[in-house]
């Protein structure tokens, strides 16, 4: 990139700025200064107004921007007005002035957020050309003064307000710079990577690691990386300007001007690092120099704006606010789906840490929210900033999040204190290893030894098993073997990444050390989760488990979070008398008031329910949990009152005593085998089929299509003259009858079996209706349905069907799974086959007949949502009769309460 050339001659903008400064001298008005000279770029449209008015002489309180044009640009020019509007919004201003030497106009933002014309100056309407500007200077200068004084009047009466330098620097300008340059940079990176295979491959490796963080925002690798490049530059420029008062080496940031290139900029910042640390903030993102010239001008503009506005003169508290808001903007722009909200991080730290004087760590630090919460809580209790920082450790696998993390934990009052921050995969962190950090005073190296930690607090990465990076597969294989050797429990290859990390962290904790983690809720309702839970018991005392009963913790993610509080113990067989507290938080953690937050923390730390409107708890011993889970009830149900299960356990049996589970078809190519409409296939090869439960409204269901099931070879079909069927097969094969699609799961490929037929079905992802539907005839079903068949030994199918749909049957379905981000229930075929039902053998013939009769009143109507269903008089009579038939009608209200409570928790995340 070539050097950017600046104007040497004094532009009219500089003349106007100078004249305004002179006229303000000694006036005693609220407008104290004017500026803007340093950001008058000539190569492109600037990010900033040509003239800035300030409410203070230090130029930290921006009042208004002016956009200047020569007379050949009309004052009504739409592009001019739009440009001025954009700049005002970026600076957080509610007014602007446009001036073309012929006319002047003041615009003020109305209550609806639109800028509307407030005043016009036309005293120089005779100025028509650039030459006239020079000729009639003496006539337009008084108009400039008149505009300034009018603006001052609007300032005095409150119509015009000053913008906050905090929001301007950390939000408005950063967002503006990113939005107007993202696609330019993306295109440039794409062009350059087409010339450089190493660059292309590096970008793809980066995208594989980070793409999930951009799923809600960017689905294009180049746009996502462009955004990261721009944030890398804005974060570094802002941070250097913010700390230069305290670290003189950072004054070198002023050298990034219009005569420099991006490579020069990196070298200037590297010089700052050599003298004063903050390496994690100042580290350049790879390929950050691959930006177009126009983008570099914007970055220089941003830097010069910070210099001209004397950011270093802002008081410490405001600077701290700028740093914090910069972190928020960076997180928002990246839209990291699982970034930890600060209130959640603060609560997690306080319910986990036992001794604030000991070393604490977040080894999946991400953007540093948890580490910041640790430092803040330490500082409040031990009253020594140096010790708070010295005993807090943070690391992450990737360097980029640590740039934001370093800014997040930076304390303007404690800039000279080294930060224990390093880049390492969590599986590679070892106690006793040496790391090098920088002394922020002189840039010298400091060698630190990783200690055993008193506490580790982390939001573990929500990475599904099939998305784990290749470089971590080896670690996972090693830990799978270690866990099996220690516990006898085998983790399958479909176990998610977070399931392994607590076992690694065990090594890094001191004796009785505490671990507080946020993980996905999937472990609460799956076989894999059951293995995880049981293996944890060998390594840790599980003290508390928390989930939300009031909105989700992560607003921009579909993942539902849980908190686990663990205490390290000797690896040994679990003590089944140990008790676990299962907590429901009843306040929105992201908006919880301070008093309620304190109540929540007190409750969990003391294992005591203090205010049920804030949090409720259910407590179980490990042996209680083992007993409950044998009835097909998941861990997810333990947050609710299910103590009544002890009263009913002798009256229930596994549903597999009455039903056989049927495997739904997984064809690999549905269009070959699922027939909906006319076809040339012979009728004898077509069987009734149900693909989905979406349209099932009642307790009975009918097939909604046909399935192609052929048990004959091609030769047999030819011999039998089955030309229509052969025609269908040829539609999906070559001349040799070999399949065009390689994903088909049958052998021979066209022979889907017809023997797997179901009598009953239910959905894998039910929502507000919980029921099992009976099919009018035995049908083939798709894999997405949970399908069952009556066993030949069943004497009374009507009774079994009724019992499956009783209040206990609905509870059994709800209690078997866990909630997903969309609010639906997630249950699996393997999990479902473990649920129990009321044992029909224990019901008398008389009661059975009455139950069937009562069920017939609801069987033929539409299934209602649970709340409505339970309010229905016929339903109540049926459910109470079922419970009365086993001598436990008194449990009706308990079961109803449990069912409604579980549904509320599942739906509150929407």
Labelled PLM ranges:
Residues 246, 276-351, 819:
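Class I S-adenosyl-L-methionine
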Residues 43-46, 91, 96, 103, ...:
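Signature of N6-adenine DNA methyltransferases within the class I
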Residues 1-40, 44:
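Acidic-basic catalytic patches of nuclease active cores, encompassing PD-(D/E)XK
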Residues 806, 846-910:
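Amphipathic alpha-helical coiled-coil/heptad-repeat segments
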Residues 626-853, 857, 863:
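Polybasic, glycine- and aromatic-enriched phosphate-binding surface used to engage nucleic acids
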Residues 222-249, 458-459, 499, 507, ...:
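P-loop NTPase catalytic cores that bind/hydrolyze ATP
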Residues 49, 54-56, 60-69, 74-85, ...:
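Charged, often flexible domain-edge or linker segments that flank or initiate folded functional domains
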Residues 32-57, 452:
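Catalytic centers of nucleases
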């Amino acid at each position: 990139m070539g050097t950017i050339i600046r104007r040497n001659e004094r532009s009219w903008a500089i003349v106007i700025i100078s004249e305004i400064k002179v006229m303000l001298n000694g006036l005693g008005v609220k407008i104290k200064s004017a500026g803007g000279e340093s950001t008058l770029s000539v190569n492109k449209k600037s990010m900033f107004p040509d003239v800035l008015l300030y409410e203070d002489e230090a130029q930290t309180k921006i009042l208004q921007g002016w956009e200047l044009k020569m007379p050949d640009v009309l004052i009504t020019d739409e592009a001019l007005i739009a440009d001025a509007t954009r700049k005002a919004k970026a600076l957080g201003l509610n007014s602007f002035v446009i001036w073309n030497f012929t006319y002047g106009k003041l615009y003020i933002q109305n209550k609806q957020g639109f800028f509307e014309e407030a005043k016009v100056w036309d005293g120089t309407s005779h100025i028509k050309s650039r030459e006239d500007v020079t000729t009639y200077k003496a006539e337009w200068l008084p108009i400039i003064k008149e505009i300034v004084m009018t603006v001052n009047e609007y300032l005095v009466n409150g119509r015009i307000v000053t913008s906050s330098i905090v929001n301007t620097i950390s939000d408005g300008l950063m967002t503006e710079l990113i939005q107007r340059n993202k696609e330019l940079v993306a295109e440039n990176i794409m062009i350059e990577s087409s010339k450089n295979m190493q660059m292309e491959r590096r970008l793809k490796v980066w995208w594989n690691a980070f793409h999930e963080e951009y799923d809600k925002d960017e689905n294009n690798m180049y746009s996502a990386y462009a955004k990261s490049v721009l944030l890398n530059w804005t974060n570094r420029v802002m941070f250097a300007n913010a700390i230069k008062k305290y670290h003189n080496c950072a004054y070198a940031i002023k050298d990034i001007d219009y005569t420099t290139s991006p490579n020069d900029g990196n070298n200037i910042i590297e010089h700052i690092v050599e003298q004063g640390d903050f390496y994690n903030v100042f580290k350049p993102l790879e390929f950050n120099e691959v930006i177009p010239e126009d983008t570099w001008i914007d970055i220089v503009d941003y830097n010069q704006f910070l210099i001209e506005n004397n950011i270093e003169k802002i008081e410490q508290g405001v600077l701290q606010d700028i740093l914090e808001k910069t972190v928020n903007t960076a997180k928002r722009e990246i839209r990291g789906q699982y970034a930890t909200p600060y209130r959640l991080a603060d609560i997690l730290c306080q319910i986990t840490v036992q001794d604030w004087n000991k070393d604490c760590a977040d080894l999946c630090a991400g953007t540093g929210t948890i580490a910041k919460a640790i430092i803040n809580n330490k500082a409040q209790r031990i009253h020594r900033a140096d010790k708070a920082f010295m005993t807090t450790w943070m690391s992450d696998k990737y360097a980029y999040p640590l740039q934001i993390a370093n800014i997040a934990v930076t304390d303007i009052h404690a800039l000279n204190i080294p930060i224990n921050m390093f880049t390492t995969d969590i599986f590679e962190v070892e106690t006793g290893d040496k790391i090098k950090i920088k002394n922020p005073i002189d840039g010298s190296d400091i060698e630190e030894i990783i200690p055993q930690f008193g506490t580790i607090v982390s939001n573990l990465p929500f990475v599904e098993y099939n998305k784990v990076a290749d470089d971590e597969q080896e670690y996972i294989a090693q830990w799978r073997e270690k866990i099996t050797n220690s516990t006898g429990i085998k983790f399958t290859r479909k176990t998610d990444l977070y399931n392994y990390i607590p076992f690694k962290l065990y090594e890094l904790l001191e004796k009785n050390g505490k671990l507080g983690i946020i993980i996905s809720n999937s472990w609460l309702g799956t076989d894999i989760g059951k293995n995880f839970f049981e293996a944890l018991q060998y390594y840790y005392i599980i003290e508390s488990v928390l989930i939300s009963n009031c909105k989700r913790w992560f607003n921009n993610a579909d993942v539902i979070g849980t908190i686990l509080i663990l205490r390290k113990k000797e690896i040994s067989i679990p003590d089944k008398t140990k008790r676990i507290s299962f907590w429901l938080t009843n306040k929105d953690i992201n908006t919880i008031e301070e008093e309620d937050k304190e109540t929540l923390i007190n409750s969990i730390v003391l294992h005591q329910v203090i205010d049920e409107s804030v949090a409720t708890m259910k407590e179980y011993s490990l042996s209680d949990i083992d007993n409950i889970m044998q009835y097909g009830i998941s861990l997810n149900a333990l947050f609710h009152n299910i103590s009544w299960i002890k009263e009913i356990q002798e009256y229930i049996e596994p549903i597999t005593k009455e039903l056989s589970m049927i495997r739904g078809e997984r064809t690999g190519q549905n269009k070959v085998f699922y027939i909906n409409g006319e076809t040339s296939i012979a009728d004898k090869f077509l069987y009734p089929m149900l693909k989905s439960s979406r349209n099932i409204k009642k307790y009975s269901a009918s097939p909604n299509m046909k399935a192609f099931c052929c048990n004959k070879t091609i030769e047999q079909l030819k011999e039998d003259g089955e030309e229509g069927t052969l025609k269908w097969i040829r539609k999906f094969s070559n001349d040799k009858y070999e399949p065009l699609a390689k994903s088909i799961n049958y052998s021979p490929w066209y022979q889907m079996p017809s023997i797997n037929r179901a009598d009953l079905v239910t959905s894998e992802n039910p929502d507000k209706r919980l029921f099992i539907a009976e099919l009018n005839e035995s049908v083939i079903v798709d894999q997405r349905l949970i399908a069952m068949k009556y066993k030949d030994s069943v004497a009374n199918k009507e009774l079994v069907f009724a019992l499956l749909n009783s209040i206990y049957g609905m509870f059994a379905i709800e209690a078997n799974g866990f909630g997903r981000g969309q609010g639906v229930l997630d249950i699996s075929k393997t999990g479902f086959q473990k649920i129990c039902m009321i044992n029909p053998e224990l019901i008398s013939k008389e009661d059975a007949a009455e139950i069937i009769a009562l069920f017939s009143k609801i069987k033929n109507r539409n299934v209602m949502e649970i709340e409505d269903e339970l309010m229905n008089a016929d339903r109540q009579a049926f459910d109470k009769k079922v419970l009365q038939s086993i001598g436990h009608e008194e449990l009706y209200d308990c079961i109803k309460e449990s069912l409604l409570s579980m549904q509320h928790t599942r739906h509150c995340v929407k």
